[in-house]
Amino acid sequence: MASKSVVVFLFLALVASSVVAQAPGPAPTISPLPATPTPSQSPRATAPAPSPSANPPPSAPTTAPPVSQPPTESPPAPPTSTSPSGAPGTNVPSGEAGPAQSPLSGSPNAAAVSRVSLVGTFAGVAVIAALLL
């Protein structure tokens, strides 16, 4: 009786590993490009240094040249549409990659995936049959 429970456990482990192996991975994310290039700092005009003998009058205020700082805000993320089930929509603006999909039925990758899954299925059935006999 214990050998049958081991066989059932191995069968369930095989099914679980097959499900994990065929689960789709996370979709790649694309960071948006900035709308405007970052502004370069303009060269500052250097004021002539005063001579040590000439002191400015105490009533004259000293001002520092203005410093331009780059904007700190990042561009807003593009809106994404979602279907009622919560899956990403397929309305993708032109020029951007669409959501990751499983291989189409006509692609050569689909045939390779199908062959791998068939080989795995037959190997699992053979192992289970050998353990039961």
Swiss-Prot record:
In its UniProt entry, the species of origin is given as: Arabidopsis thaliana (Mouse-ear cress)
Q: How does it sit in the membrane?
A: Lipid-anchor; GPI-anchor
Question: Where are lipid groups covalently attached, annotated GPI-anchor amidated asparagine?
Answer: 109
Family indicated by similarity: Belongs to the classical AGP family.
- Span list, region Disordered: 23-110
| Residue ranges of the propeptide | 110-133
What's noted about post-translational modification? O-glycosylated on the hydroxyproline residues.
Q: Does the keyword Signal apply?
A: yes
Instruction: List Pyrrolidone carboxylic acid occurrences by residue.
Output: 22
**Protein function:** Proteoglycan that seems to be implicated in diverse developmental roles such as differentiation, cell-cell recognition, embryogenesis and programmed cell death.
Kindly state one GO CC term assigned in the UniProt record: plasma membrane
List the signal peptide residues: 1-21
Annotated coiled-coil positions are none
Protein name per Swiss-Prot or TrEMBL? Classical arabinogalactan protein 5
Q: Specify residue ranges for compositional bias: Pro residues.
A: 25-37, 49-81
The UniProt regions of compositional bias labelled Low complexity, in chain numbering, are: 38-48
Q: Where is this protein localized, as stated in its record?
A: Cell membrane
Q: In which tissues is it expressed?
A: Expressed at a low level in flowers and siliques.
